[in-house]
């Protein structure tokens, strides 16, 4: 509904300041409605999947989001070129409403009760207080914020970088963004399965650390390479590799957050996601400021460094074993 209203607003408002205020209001309300999506999905995975398959499931869910993001570049671009940006939002919102109706009809009405809920669980206020005393929560939130800083730079400034800095034609830039996002989605799916495999082979702590450090570290390396090559194809290939490796860690973040949270896994996932959104908010605003001082290469390299450092925080994160509730006491 809010997507449709975004397009409708463009028809009824012409003053730029009124349009800005309207967009802030509509998108803010959309954000409130969308906020439970990722934490809720991770909560459902934790309730319904065995521990050895949770990262795989979380990776597949987040990969689905990236497929949608990837299709926006050529899809919305074509709609805007063919119709208008207002109609693009109306059509996209209509498709989303139709899918929501189908989901409502086909999805199960309820979920099985999670296995770890007992009659002697502590009071809600005690669990929340104990959760926020966990160093694991703060460590994973900081790491996710640093990861999101790099990720959101690519989301919001990649088109500008291709079109204005590299002077790539619009249609080529859109398809480059499509393939880069598809690569990231593939990385999420592969990373989720790789996380479960690594945990089985190396143990939960070591396995997840290996995936997180490898994914964020290699993503930073290929991001650095992308700004040091010249051809359009080479830049696209390096950014695709960078985002594929970066995407590998999405499943391990969400799976670990719900493990840390225990009975408060929804809150833990939401808190981590808030930290990620803080990093994602700072990045699009700060990047052009940094680019004025260091150039776009410098701004991207700094984001790569932030993500790389964020990967090392995983050395401080200890994953609880299955059935162990860190905040039950």
Enumerate the predicted regions with their spans:
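Helix-loop-helix hairpin linking two adjacent transmembrane segments in secondary transporters
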Residues: 61-111
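Cytoplasmic helix-loop-helix junction between adjacent transmembrane helices
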Residues: 24-66
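Intracellular juxtamembrane helix-capping segments at the cytosolic ends
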Residues: 36-49, 247-261
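Extracytoplasmic gate region of multi-pass secondary transporters
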Residues: 134-189, 247-250, 254, 258
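Hydrophobic core of transmembrane alpha-helices in multi-pass small-molecule transporters
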Residues: 2-5, 18-36, 233-248
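C-terminal ends and interior cores of transmembrane alpha-helices
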Residues: 1-17, 217-230
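C-terminal transmembrane helical hairpin of 12-TM major facilitator-type secondary transporters
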Residues: 205-253
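Flexible cytoplasmic inter-helical loops of multi-pass small-molecule transporters
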Residues: 104-127, 323-329
């Amino acid at each position: 509904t809010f997507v449709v209203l975004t397009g409708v607003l463009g028809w009824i408002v012409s003053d730029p300041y009124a349009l800005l205020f309207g967009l802030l209001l509509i998108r803010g309300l959309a954000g409130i409605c969308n906020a439970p999506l990722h934490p809720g999905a991770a909560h459902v995975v934790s309730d319904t999947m065995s521990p050895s398959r949770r990262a795989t499931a979380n990776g597949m869910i987040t990969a689905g989001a990236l497929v949608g993001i990837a299709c926006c570049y050529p899809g919305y671009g074509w709609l805007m070129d063919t119709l208008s940006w207002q109609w693009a939002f109306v059509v996209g919102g209509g498709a989303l409403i139709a899918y929501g109706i189908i989901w409502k009809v086909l999805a199960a009405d309820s979920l099985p009760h999670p296995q770890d809920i007992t009659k002697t669980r502590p009071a809600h206020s005690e669990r929340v207080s104990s959760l926020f005393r966990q160093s694991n929560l703060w460590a994973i939130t900081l790491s996710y914020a640093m990861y999101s800083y790099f990720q959101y730079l690519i989301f919001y400034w990649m088109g500008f970088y291709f079109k204005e800095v590299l002077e790539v034609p619009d249609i080529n830039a859109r398809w480059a963004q499509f393939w880069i996002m598809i690569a990231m989605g593939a990385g999420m799916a592969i990373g989720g399965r790789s996380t479960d495999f690594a945990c089985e082979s190396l143990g939960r702590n070591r396995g997840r650390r290996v995936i997180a450090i490898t994914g964020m570290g290699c993503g930073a390396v290929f991001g650095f390479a992308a700004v040091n090559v010249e051809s359009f194809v080479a830049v696209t290939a390096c950014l695709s590799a960078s985002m594929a490796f970066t995407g590998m860690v999405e499943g391990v973040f969400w799976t670990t957050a719900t493990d840390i949270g225990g009975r408060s896994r929804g809150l833990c996932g939401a808190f981590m996601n808030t930290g990620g959104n803080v990093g994602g908010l700072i990045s699009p605003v700060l990047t052009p400021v940094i680019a004025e001082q260091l150039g776009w290469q410098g701004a991207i390299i700094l984001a790569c460094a932030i993500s790389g450092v964020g990967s090392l925080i995983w050395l401080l994160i200890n994953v609880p074993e299955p059935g162990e509730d860190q905040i039950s006491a």
